[in-house]
Each structure stands twice: as C-alpha cells, then as structure tokens.
C-alpha cells in the first residue's frame, strides 16, 4: 500500500521508523481534535504556497492547478462539515495533505516542498488570530456605540460617584458610561497594536533554517495579506509572542468587563436599584419565585478568570523552551482559542445587554442626595471665599458630622447653622449644595457636566466612525 492510501495509523513520516506508533501515543499526541479549527487558514496558506512554487518553477502549472482544485474541494468539505478527520494523522496539516494526495495523486505530495509544519502552523495561527482580532475589535466598537447612545440618553441623570464604594461626589450616569467607553477604547487600541505586530509572514522559514528552494517569501506574504515576511527563520518558528500578547489583551478586556459586571450586579440589587436589566438577560431561581438574577453579568465576571488562565498557560508553556519548534507548542492552541472565544462572546453579551438597560433616575438621584455628595463643593466654595483648602476641609468635616447627627443633608441646614462652622458662608452657598449645581460646575474637558458629557459622546462617535 502506498503512503498516499495509508491506513489509519500509518503517518506520513514513517520512513525512518521500524515499528508503528503505540496506539496510546497516537491518541495522546494527536491535536486534530482542536487544531482542525485552523483548517481554512491552513488551506489558505497552502494555496499561496502552491502559487509561489509554480511561479518559481518548483511546480508545473498543471501540478499547481491540480493542487488548487483539490484544496478548493477540501475547503468545501470542511465548510460543509464533511471532511473525514483522522486522529491517526495527528494534526490539521497532515489530514489536509493526506486528503489532497488521495484526491489528486502525486502532485499532492509536492505541496510540502520548501515548507515545514513549523512555519505552516506559525502562519496558520497568525492568519486565525488576525481574523479573530478584527472580529473582536468590531464587537468592541459595537459595544462602544451602545455606550455612547446610553450616555447621551442619560447625560442629565445624576447618580452618586463612589470611592471605596462610599458616596463621594455627584456624577451623571452618562459620564459613568463614557468611563466604560474609554476602557474599551484602550482595548481596541491594544488589539490594533497586537495585530500590527503579528502581521508578518513566517511561511518560508521551513523547519528553522529556511529552505534551499528558490522561494519568493515576499510574494507569499503579499498574497496572504501580511505586511512583510518575518526577518529571521529561527525566530519565525520559535515566536509565540503574538499569542501571548493577544491573551494579555484579552485578559484586560475581561478585567474591564468584569469591573463593569460588578457594578451592574450591584446596581440591579434592591439595595441600589439604579438600573433594571431586560428579562431576556436574566434568570430565575429554582426555589425562590421572586428572584431575577443578573446571570449574564455574573458569568462575564467569572469568565475573566478563564482569560487570565489562558495567559498564564501560554506564559508558562513558553518560559523553558529552547528556540525553534518543540512539541510543547501543540499546547498553545486551546488556551488561545479559549481566550478568543471568551473575549468575543463576553463582548457580544454586553454589547447586546448594556444599551438595553433602563435607569431608575429617581433612585440614582436619591442615592446621591443621601451621601453628602456635595461636601467637596462646599469645601471648594470656602476656598473661593479665601480659606486654605485644608481649613475648608476641616470646616466641612465638622458640618457633615453635625448634619449626620441631625439626620439631615447639608443642603437642609439653615444658613445660621452653616455659619456656626464658618462666617465665610453666605446665602449663595445653597446653589453650590444642589446636585445639579455640583455636576454643572464641572464643565471642563473630561468633566461630568451634562454639556461636557454630550460633547464627549459626540467626540466618541467621531472616533468610532
């Protein structure tokens, strides 16, 4: 039996061996159960390689055409989920090459000329990750669009800003949504930077030292949409920085979403009551009929652990390897795939859910009023009256203690009561102590004043355009 028609268990590299691979080792070392996900990228790289080999005279035009036709048929099998994957053939590369040779005969055996699985997998993963980054950046932008719309809708809605989860100063709900937007904007920028760095083509590096065939790496890189070939053949097959960098970026995305999720969970609770999530994004309890649980937000918060786990897996995987390809690197696919899926799905969930929430404006305003949120405004007022800030801070602290004992807000104290703490306080102080006056006073760039929120939202729209 020729190797082209190899029975399951007879790999395409058996010429040097005198006994068959142990059945357990075949199962243990096979990766096709997960790297089959790279099939379309593998075919794309093979098509470019075949065209380049023909252009350089390594393949005849007839061989090139047969290979391209065979690969097109295999692509259709993959897309239609009819491809006969075999774990005995180890990985996505050997499965596709074996299938190609079955279909077109001798020409299929020539496709691997001037190429190794080492540069092949490095190319496949870069192609895959480039597409994944484009998809994730699009979901980030979609979520950002939703946040901008929500910010504009709630530009005048006053809520408490917190430090240490204690009421600090009044802000607007729209301002808070634009803070989320900025977190995602940094994420989009980081992914664009990651994409730029990974967009170099390793194909042609072969096993580690390059190839003696007269290949044209620039042509292959151009056809595959890369900016240029990689510069060093040894580094080309050794490098997994781009995968680690992506997982770091994905981890940051999930950290940001997790922080948002924590706030959403708090805000939906009866103790806060700031927002209501649509029923379609919540679940109930098997025992408590009154429950409406923010499960989507909680799951996103939990999935941050998965993304961080993927990053640690890859860092640990690479830390002790000598240069060039080592079989350890087979283990890079699953954490990378999981990081891609986790980031994409979490963003999709939030891009759908968050813009659809409803805000309880009365509860938000009442919470801001209840926590002496305008105390800093009173201190600023006293500074404008000539007090040093530290003295003003002391005065307001005593006034807050007095109001707390009286179970009243600062704005509910009389002028006479306020003046017992400082004679610099005049009757114009009450405009300062209102929630609306507090947020309106912060009308500088980046401030929480409603007109600034609208201006920031418009600028955000323009950046997304």
UniProtKB/Swiss-Prot annotation:
Q: What is this protein called?
A: Argininosuccinate lyase
Query: Which Pfam families does the entry link to?
Result: ASL_C2, Lyase_1
The family assignment reads: Belongs to the lyase 1 family. Argininosuccinate lyase subfamily.
Q: Does the keyword Amino-acid biosynthesis apply?
A: yes
Q: Where in the cell is it found?
A: Cytoplasm
Q: Which reaction does it catalyse?
A: 2-(N(omega)-L-arginino)succinate = fumarate + L-arginine
The record's keywords, sorted A to Z, are:
Amino-acid biosynthesis, Arginine biosynthesis, Cytoplasm, Lyase
Kindly list the biological process annotations in GO that this record carries.
Answer: arginine biosynthetic process via ornithine; L-arginine biosynthetic process
Tell me the pathway.
Amino-acid biosynthesis; L-arginine biosynthesis; L-arginine from L-ornithine and carbamoyl phosphate: step 3/3
Spell out the molecular function terms from Gene Ontology. argininosuccinate lyase activity
Q: What class of enzyme is it?
A: lyase
Q: What is its main location?
A: cytoplasm
Which gene name belongs to this protein? argH
Listed as disulfide-bonded, the cysteine pairs are: none
Q: Look up the EC number in the record and give it.
A: 4.3.2.1
């Amino acid at each position: 039996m020729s190797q082209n028609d190899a029975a399951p268990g007879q790999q395409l590299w058996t010429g040097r061996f005198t006994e068959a691979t142990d059945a357990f080792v075949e199962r243990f070392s096979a990766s096709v159960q997960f790297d089959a996900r790279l099939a379309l990228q593998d075919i794309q790289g093979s098509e470019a390689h075949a065209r380049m080999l023909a252009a350089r005279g390594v393949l005849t035009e007839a061989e090139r055409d047969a290979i391209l036709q065979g690969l097109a048929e295999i692509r259709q099998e993959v897309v239609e989920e009819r491809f006969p994957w075999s774990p005995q053939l180890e990985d996505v590369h050997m499965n596709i090459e074996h299938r190609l040779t079955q279909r077109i005969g001798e020409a299929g055996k020539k496709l691997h000329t001037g190429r190794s699985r080492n540069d092949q997998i490095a190319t496949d993963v870069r192609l895959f990750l480039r597409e994944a980054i484009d998809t994730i950046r699009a979901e980030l932008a979609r979520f950002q669009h939703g946040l901008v719309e929500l910010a504009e809708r709630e530009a005048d809605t006053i809520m408490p800003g917190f430090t240490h989860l204690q009421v600090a100063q009044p802000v607007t709900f729209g301002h808070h949504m634009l803070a989320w937007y900025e977190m995602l904007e940094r994420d989009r920028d980081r992914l664009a930077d990651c994409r730029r760095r990974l967009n170099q083509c390793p194909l042609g590096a072969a096993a580690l030292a390059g190839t003696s065939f007269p290949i044209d790496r620039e042509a292959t890189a151009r056809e595959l949409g890369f900016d240029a070939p990689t510069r060093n053949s040894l580094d080309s097959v050794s490098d997994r920085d781009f995968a680690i960098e992506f997982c770091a970026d994905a981890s940051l995305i999930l950290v940001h979403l997790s922080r948002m999720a924590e706030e959403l969970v708090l805000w939906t609770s009866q103790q806060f009551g700031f927002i209501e999530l649509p029923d379609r994004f919540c679940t109930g309890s098997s025992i408590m009929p009154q429950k409406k649980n923010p499960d989507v937000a909680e799951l996103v918060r939990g999935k941050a652990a998965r993304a961080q786990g993927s990053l640690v897996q890859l860092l640990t995987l690479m830390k002790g390897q000598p240069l060039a390809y080592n079989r350890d690197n087979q283990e890079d696919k699953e954490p990378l795939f999981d990081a891609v899926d986790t980031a994409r799905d979490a963003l999709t969930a939030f891009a759908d859910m968050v813009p659809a929430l409803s805000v309880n404006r009365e509860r938000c305003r009442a919470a801001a009023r209840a926590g002496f949120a305008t105390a800093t405004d009173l201190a600023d007022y006293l500074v404008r009256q000539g007090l040093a800030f530290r003295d003003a801070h002391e005065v307001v602290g005593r006034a807050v203690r007095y109001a707390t004992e009286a179970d009243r807000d600062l704005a509910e104290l009389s002028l006479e009561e306020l003046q017992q703490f400082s004679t610099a306080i005049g009757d114009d102080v009450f405009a300062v102590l209102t929630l609306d006056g507090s947020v309106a006073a912060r009308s500088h760039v980046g401030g929480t004043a409603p007109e600034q929120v609208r201006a920031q939202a418009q600028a955000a729209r323009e950046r997304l355009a």
